[in-house]
Curated annotation (Swiss-Prot):
UniProt protein name: Enolase
Pathway recorded for this protein: Carbohydrate degradation; glycolysis; pyruvate from D-glyceraldehyde 3-phosphate: step 4/5
Broad EC category: lyase
Catalytic activities: (2R)-2-phosphoglycerate = phosphoenolpyruvate + H2O
Family according to the record: Belongs to the enolase family.
Organism: Leuconostoc mesenteroides subsp. mesenteroides (strain ATCC 8293 / DSM 20343 / BCRC 11652 / CCM 1803 / JCM 6124 / NCDO 523 / NBRC 100496 / NCIMB 8023 / NCTC 12954 / NRRL B-1118 / 37Y)
SUPFAM superfamilies: Enolase C-terminal domain-like, Enolase N-terminal domain-like
Length: 441
């Protein structure tokens, strides 16, 4: 048993230059752990509360000194000298009870999560094992298939593209290291194509390119060209995923979806489902995130009934990593996958519970970054610890994104011959026939 002897928090900056929170946990046997918290650009309305100061004279109101004070005062008093650092569940539960709200609005999910991560890292450090081994044990061996966001739109950029993310997934690679190479080569091939056509190659929050396009289909055409230019076969070697972030397009009063940044077209829900189905039929799209507004549960069930056998339908804003929402979705047959963002729920314990529930229901779980990231690589260890099988952590540029990929390479090397990269088979929520169709598009 090794008690927590000190907890320290400070305000630092994320990848967008906005303040965020970092916490450190120290144990009586010298264990040390540090956790940094990301933040999102488009956030679900049901996410746990990210506590900000609201003082407009400082960081435009985005300061985190209140959350820092909560760690250094209330949380430290509750945990220091009272908890064994290896008792992650008890530590997380104590902070949840101390907060006393359903959405962590008192202490702030950012304050609680930073300590949750730091405690896990301190325990791993004290035991002398990698974080993924500490969190997952001896059965942690699956390296994830990456979702690489190479074209940004929507809230993640200033262009005229409605969909928030256009991603490539190296489903045919033999290892995660090779998958990262596939992605890097395709990313650079895409850059050359954009430059040749006179399009901008500046990047958005997540490291992807953010040029203007005529509509939401043009980026898909560029992805196909880039995959082929890099020497790979679309579908078989590299599939495509999109994040529609449809809550940004939805008008709850008229119950329509409007392509507000591109053509201005409006769709009823059945029309919008048909629009997405048409794109999935014509391109090797294997995954669609948030295709329906986060509050329209019946419509989620409808699109799942229509497309759920052949395309991964991911709930991000829809589920917000919350087991209550996930359980409701499972019972309704809504979605077939959940995006896992640790700061949406606020502790590692609750994150593990969401991943476990998803797997038991046959849903995939995709461990994800946020648009405002840090150099913290916890999600790389988390995805291997849980054998989740898929990770979404940005493009092949910006150190805050590359840090996660580099950590996966290190983990694969540590696991050596026991490591397994499942590629297309990480989509266990799709039928074998559906996977074959995507590979042959």
């Amino acid at each position: 048993m090794s008690l927590i002897t000190d907890i320290i928090a400070r305000e630092v900056l994320d990848s967008r230059g906005n303040p965020t929170l970092e916490a450190e946990v120290i144990t009586e046997l010298g264990g040390f752990g540090r956790g940094m918290v990301p933040s999102g650009a488009s956030t679900g309305e049901h996410e746990a509360v990210e506590l900000r100061d609201g003082d407009k004279s400082r960081f435009g109101g985005k300061g985190t000194t209140k959350a820092v004070a909560n760690v250094n005062d209330a949380i430290a008093k509750a945990l220091v000298g009272k908890f064994d650092v290896t008792d992650q569940r008890a530590i997380d539960q104590a902070m949840i009870e101390l907060d006393g709200t359903e959405n962590k609005g008192n202490l702030g999910a950012n304050a609680i999560l930073a300590v949750s991560i730091a405690a896990a890292r301190a325990a791993a450090d004290e035991l002398g094992v990698p974080l993924f081994s500490y969190l997952g044990g001896a059965n942690s061996y699956v390296l994830p298939t990456p979702m690489m966001n190479v074209i940004n739109g929507g809230a993640h950029s200033a262009n005229k593209v409605d969909f928030q993310e256009f991603m490539i997934m190296p489903v045919g690679a033999p290892t995660v290291k090779e998958a990262i190479r596939y992605g890097s080569e395709t990313f650079h091939a895409l850059k050359k194509l954009l430059e040749a056509d006179g399009k901008a190659t500046s990047v958005g929050d997540e490291g992807g390119f953010a040029p203007d396009f005529a509509d939401n289909e043009e980026p898909l055409k560029y992805l196909i060209r880039a995959i082929e230019a890099a020497g790979y076969k679309p579908g078989k070697d590299i599939a495509i995923a999109v994040d529609v972030a449809s809550s940004e397009l939805y008008d709850a009063e008229t119950k329509t979806y409007k392509l507000r940044w591109s053509t201005g077209e409006e769709f009823t829900t059945p029309e919008f489902i048909k629009y997405l189905e048409d794109l999935a039929d014509r391109y090797p799209i294997i995954s669609i995130e948030d295709p329906i507004d986060e509050n329209e549960w019946e419509d989620w069930a409808a699109i799942t009934a229509e497309l759920g056998k052949k395309v991964q339908l991911v709930g991000d804003d829809f589920f917000v990593t919350n087991t209550q929402y996930l359980e409701k979705g499972i019972n309704m047959g809504a979605a077939n996958s959940i995006l896992i963002k640790v700061n949406q729920i606020g502790t590692l314990t609750e994150t593990f519970e969401a991943i476990e529930m998803a797997k038991e229901a046959g849903y995939t779980a995709i461990v994800s970054h946020r648009s405002g990231e840090t150099e913290d690589t916890t999600i790389s260890d988390l995805v291997v610890a849980t054998n989740a099988g898929q990770i979404k952590t940005g493009s092949l540029s910006r150190t805050d994104r590359i840090a996660k990929y580099n950590q996966l390479i290190r983990i694969e090397e540590l696991l050596d011959t026991t490591a397994k990269y499942k590629g297309i088979h990480s989509f266990y929520n799709l039928s074998a026939a559906a996977r074959e169709v995507i590979e042959n598009k």
